[in-house]
Amino acid sequence: MAAAAALEAVAPLGTLWGLVQDFVMGQQEGPADQVAADVKSGSYTVLQVVEALGSSLENPEPRTRARGIQLLSQVLLQCHSLLLEKEVVHLILFYENRLKDHHLVIPSVLQGLRALSLCVTLPPGLAVSVLKAIFQEVHVQSLPQVDRHTVYSIITNFMRAREEELKGLGADFTFGFIQVMDGEKDPRNLLVAFHIVYDLISRDYSLGPFVEELFEVTSCYFPIDFTPPPNDPHGIQREDLILSLRAVLASTPRFAEFLLPLLIEKVDSEILSAKLDSLQTLNACCAVYGQKELKDFLPSLWASIRREVFQTASERVEAEGLAALNSLTACLSRSVLRADAEDLLDSFLSNILQDCRHHLCEPDMKLVWPSAKLLQAAAGASARACDHVTSNVLPLLLEQFHKHSQSNQRRTILEMILGFLKLQQKWSYEDKDERPLSGFKDQLCSLMFMALTDPNTQLQLVGIRTLTVLGAQPDLLSSGDLELAVGHLYRLSFLEEDSQSCRVAALEASGTLATLYPMAFSSHLVPRLAEDLCTEESDLARADGPTRCSRHPRCLQALSAISTHPSIVKETLPLLLQHLCQMNRGSVSPGTSEVIAVCQSLQQVAENCQRDPESCWYFHQTAVPCLLALVVQASAPEKEHSVLKKVLLEDEVLATMASVIATATTHLSPDLASQSVAHIVPLFLDGNISFLPENSFSGRFQPFQDGSSGQRRLVALLMAFVCSLPRNVEIPQLNRLMGELLELSCCQSCPFSSTAAAKCFAGLLNKHPAGQQLDEFLQLAVDKVEAGLSSGPCRSQAFTLLLWVTKALVLRYHPLSSCLTERLMGLLSDPELGPAAADGFSLLMSDCTDVLTRAGHAEVRIMFRQRFFTDNVPALVRGFHAAPQDVKPNYLKGLSHVLNRLPKPVLLPELPTLLSLLLEALSCPDSVVQLSTLSCLQPLLLEAPQVMSLHVDTLITKFLNLSASPSMAVRIAALQCMHALTRLPTPVLLPYKPQVIRALAKPLDDKKRLVRKEAVSARGEWFLLGSPGS
C-alpha cells in the first residue's frame, strides 16, 4: 500500500520534471502555461516547481538560468494570489539576489518581481527592499523596452499598495526613480512614467532637494513631438502624451521657477504646435499657481501673449492666448492679499490697459478687435477684474461711438461694448449701486436707442442684442426705458419692410425680455397687437388682401413670440383664439394660409407653455376646447357646402391644429390628462359637446356612426390628443374606441379619415400594456387587415392599417411584428400594392412627427432599426433573388429604404454582401430608389473606402449616368457621390481621372444653380486628385 502511494506521488512530480525540462531545454513556451494551470488546480505547489527547477536555477550557463527563472516568473504571474507570506519572503530574497546575475537573466528576474509586487501577502519592508535593489543593481535604460516597462509596473504596483512604506524612503525614492526614468524614449513607457511622476507629486511623496532634477527629467520631453507610426498597434496618440506630460508639469507650484521661462521661450518660438502646447500648459498651471509663483514672470508672459494675439495668423493660437490671459488674471484675482502686499492684479490689469487703450482710439481701428479681445479675456476672469477693466474702457468706447459717424464703425464699437456688457452678467452684486454699469446707464441706453433707430441693418442688429443684454441686468432699465424699448421692438418686428434678420432678432429679443418684464409688455405691446388684430379682422371682412398679406403673419408672430411668461399667455392666448373665431364669422372666408398662420402661432405658444406646468394646463383647457368647438361647428351637416367648412376641414389646417393639440397634451401631468380625456373621448364616441364653449350646435356630432365626411375628418384631432397622453392615463370606453377606429380605418370614402383612424389605432396599440386585451386588439386588427386585403375596394385602406400597426409593434419589439413584416414583404409582389409596400419600409424605419413619437410617450426601443435590419434584410435579399423581373424594383426600393436609415456602424460590416444589390438599385428607373440609394452610398464612400474601391468602375459609371437624371435631386446626389469618390485611395482613381473630368463638364451647364454648384465642387476635387499636397 505504501509503495503504491509513493508511486502515485512520484508520478505527477515526474510529469512536472518533464514539463520543466521541455521548457528549459526545449525552448517551448507551452509547458509554462501547463505548469501554472497545474499549480492553480493544486496538482503542484510553488515549492515543488522551485525544486524541479533546482538544477536549472544553478546551471553555470546564463541562458539556462534565464529559462529556469522565466518559467518560475511566468508561473508566479498567474499564481501570485496563492503564495503564503513565508513563500513570498524567500522568493523576494531569491529574486533580489538574482538582480546581480548576468544581464541575460535580468528580464526574467524583473518579471518575477512584478508578480511578487502584486502579492497581498507581501510583508512590510520588502517593497522598499525590492526597489532599493532595482535602483542599485539595474541600469534600467540599458534594458529593452518591455523590460523597462516591467520596472515601471513594479514601481506602480508598490505605489498603489505600499504608499506609506515608500514614503518612508523619503527623497531617496524620488532620486531612485529619476535615475530609472532618465533617458526614456519609448512612448509606451513614457505614459506610465509620467503617471508615476504625477502620483509622486499629487500624493505628497518627498521630493527633497531633487525638485529641479525631477522637473528636468520630465520637461526635456516638452513640447511633445511624437508622431505615431501608421497602423500603430499600441494605439498611443500624440495627444495622450501631451496631456500626461501637461498634468505633470502643472501639478505643483514648485516647478514654476523652472517651467515658466520654458513656456515663455516656446511661446516665442516659430513652431505652431509648441506655441499651442505652451499656452495650454500655462492655462493648466494657473489653476495651481498663486501670485508668488507668477510675480516675476508677469511682464514677460503678458508680452508674449499680447504679441501672439496681435500678430498671429492662427485663430487657434489667438484663442489659446486669450484663454491663458483669462487664467492668469483669474489666478491673480483669487490670491489672498496681506495688508502690506502689492496688489499684483491691479498692476497687471493696468499694464494691459496701458498697452491696449490707445488702440481703441486709433482712427483706422486696425488693432481694435485684438485689443478688445485681450481686455475682455482679462475682464472675464473675475468680478474685480471686470470692474477694473470695464470702468476704464467703457467711457473710452462711449466717447469713440460718438466720435465716429459711419454706421460700420459704430457697429464695431457697439459690438465691443456689448462684449463687456455680457461679461457683467457673470457676476452678481447685492447692492445695485455697486454695479459698474450703474454709472453708465443713461449713456448706454442713449447709445442703444441710437443704434435701434439707425437705418443700417447691421447696427440695428447689434442694438437689439445690446438691448437684450442690458435688459438682463436687474433694475438697470427704468420703466421709461422699457416703454421706449418695447416701442422699438414693435416697430422692428412689425413695421420694418426690408430686413428679415432684424424682424427675427426683434422677435427673439421680445420673447427674452417678456420673460423678465411681463408687465411692460402687457401694458405697452399686447394692446397694440390686439388693436392690429382688430384691424386685420376688418381688412379680412373687406377682403383687403394686399393690405393684410404681410401684416397679418407678423402680428401673429409678435403675439406668439412674447408669450413666454404665464401672465402674458393669459392675455395673448384668448386674443389668438378670439381672432381665429372672428375670422370664421366674417362674410368673407379666410384663406387656408391665414388660418394655418394662426394655428402656427398657437403652436409656438403651446411650446413656450411646456416650460411651466401651470401654463401648460391653462393652454390645454383654454385652446383645445375652443379649437374642437370651431371644427365641430364647421363639420355640421348643414355647413357641408359652406366656404367655412372647406377651409377649417382642409388637410393642412387639420394637420396644423392636430399639432397644436398634441403639443398642448404631451406635457400634461397624468391627473390633468385624465380630466381632459374624460371629456374629449366622449365627445367623439357619444357626441357629448357639453364641455365645448358656445356649444349651441344644431344636429349631432357622430364621427364614427353616420356622421358626415367632415365629422369623420376630425378623428385626426382625436388621434393627436389620445396619442400624446402619458402611458399611465386610462382612456374611457377603450374597447369601443378601438373598434370604431378599426372600422373607420378601412372606410373607403375618405382616405384622410381612414389614415388618421389607422394611425390613432396604432398609437394606442403601441402604448397598451401587454396582456389579453392587447392580444384581442391585435387579433381584431389582423382579421380586419386580411379581410380588407383579400379583395374588394378597401385594399389600400387595409394596407395602410397593416403598415401602421406593424410600425407600432416594431417600435416596441412585439413578437407579432415579425409576422406582420413578413405579410408586408409578401405584398411587394402584389401588382396593385407592391410599390406602396416598398415605400412602407421607409415609414417603418423613419421617425414620425405626429404619432408614435418619444415626445408623445410612445414605446420606442432605442435599437429598433438595428433589430429590424437583422431580422428582415436577409429575407428581403432572398425575396429579391427569387422575385420575377418586374417585381425586383420593389424589393430594391424596400431594401434601399431600410439601409438608408440604418446607423452606418451597423451597415458597414454587412456592406460586402449588400453592395451588389445597392449598385443594382442605382439602375432601377424609380427616382425614389435612386435617391435613397445614393444617400446611402455617399457616407459609405467616406467610411468604407477599401470595400468601395473594389467596385470603383461600376460606381463611376452609374454616378455619371445619374448626373444626367431628369430629377434634380438625383443629379445633385449623384454629383455629391462623385465628390465623395475622391476620398478613395488615389491610385485606384487616377486611371479614371481624365474620363471623369470630361464627363463632369456637362453638368457645369445644368439649368439648375444647385446642380452646377455640386458639379463645380466635384470636378475641382477630381482635378486636384494626385497633385502634391492633395
Swiss-Prot record:
GO terms for molecular function: enzyme binding; nuclear estrogen receptor binding; transcription coactivator activity. It is found in: Nucleus; Cytoplasm, Cytoskeleton, Spindle. GO terms for biological process: chromosome segregation; DNA repair; protein maturation. The modification Phosphoserine is found at S1027. HEAT repeats lie at residues 866-904, 908-946, 949-987, 990-1028. Component of the CIA complex. In the CIA complex, interacts directly with CIAO2B and CIAO3. Component of the MMXD complex, composed of CIAO1, ERCC2, CIAO2B, MMS19 and SLC25A5. Interacts with CIAO2B; the interaction is direct. Interacts with ERCC2/XPD; the interaction is direct. Interacts with ERCC3/XPB and NCOA3/RAC3. Interacts with RTEL1; the interaction mediates the association of RTEL1 with the CIA complex. Interacts with BRIP1. This is MMS19 nucleotide excision repair protein homolog. The gene is MMS19.
